[in-house]
Amino acid sequence: MSIKPLHDRVVVKPIEADEVSAGGIVIPDSAKEKSTKGEVVAIGAGKPLDNGSLRAPVVKVGDKVIYGQYAGSSYKSEGVEYKVLREDDILAVIG
């Protein structure tokens, strides 16, 4: 992947939901909810502040995160779907 996010943007590779429920039922694509979990694969330099400095990103590459269902923009590269989010759209870091 060759994408470098700007400023406080973060590129996340969504983690797909399970194909089979806990009870063993296969879940079709049409019934799956959009993923809201993913792994950070790239981060920008940080959020520009009013005084001209940058606030360093809190997340780092490799972090597993939870983000809002409708947050960010989708980007597809080499058949892989990514989300480009603002760091503020990330709700939590998992683990």
Curated annotation (Swiss-Prot):
PANTHER family the record matches: 10 KDA HEAT SHOCK PROTEIN, CO-CHAPERONIN GROES
Subcellular location: Cytoplasm
Gene coding for it: groES
Similarity-based family: Belongs to the GroES chaperonin family.
Protein name, as recorded: Co-chaperonin GroES
An example Gene Ontology molecular-function term: metal ion binding
Gene Ontology terms describing biological process: chaperone cofactor-dependent protein refolding
Principal location: cytoplasm
HAMAP family: CH10 (MF_00580)
Stretches of the chain forming a coiled coil according to its record: none
InterPro entries (UniProt xref): Chaperonin_GroES, Chaperonin_GroES_sf, Chaprnonin_Cpn10_CS, GroES-like_sf
Complexes and interactors: Heptamer of 7 subunits arranged in a ring. Interacts with the chaperonin GroEL.
Gene Ontology cellular component annotations, sorted alphabetically: cytoplasm
The protein's role, per its UniProt record: Together with the chaperonin GroEL, plays an essential role in assisting protein folding. The GroEL-GroES system forms a nano-cage that allows encapsulation of the non-native substrate proteins and provides a physical environment optimized to promote and accelerate protein folding. GroES binds to the apical surface of the GroEL ring, thereby capping the opening of the GroEL channel.
Keyword annotations from UniProtKB, A to Z: Chaperone, Cytoplasm
Origin: domain of life: Bacteria
SUPFAM superfamilies: GroES-like (SSF50129)
Pfam families, alphabetized: Cpn10 (PF00166)
